[in-house]
Amino acid sequence: FLTIISCIVIFMGIGFGTLAYMTPPPPKPPVFPPLPPVGAVSAVLMDGNTGDIIAQKEGELKIYPASTTKILTCIIALEEGREKLDADAVITPLAIGQDGTNIGLRSDMPISLHELLYGMMLVSGNDAAVSVAETVGGSYGGFIQMMNEKAVSIGATRSHFANPNGLTD
């Protein structure tokens, strides 16, 4: 009987030793090359699969989003204004009077919401963004409220939007 137990112990020792020998080592974390100098005031490099922050420079700094605001404006317009895409858009003096890059809206210009979205996203038209907001939101203020609600719903809880085009005060 003792011989059988000895054989089992020896077999288990060899078996577990072999098993330990055959188990591959855990993978090493990736090694990234040093980051090049970043000229931006703030930057974040995130792993898109895991959400892990790989590198950052002033990543928590609140900054103006500039024309990236128009992306949120476009998302809301496509989600909430889909039925209005081919309808004539609202063009007000507020839209016409926007500073910066514009598509040249005029009050007598028939233009669809669909065309405004192109003008807003391809030309970065600030006037187009305001007209999109007034057409989709029913009012300028109503659309700004929609923007802030959407931002919270997608996790941008530290964001606050004051206009649909990203112009600073």
Locations of regions flagged by a protein language model:
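Sec-dependent N-terminal signal peptides of Gram-positive bacterial secreted proteins and lipoproteins
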Residues: 2-20
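Structural motif marking the loop-to-transmembrane transition
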Residues: 1-2, 113
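Active-site-adjacent loops and short helices of periplasmic peptidoglycan-processing enzymes
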Residues: 21-169
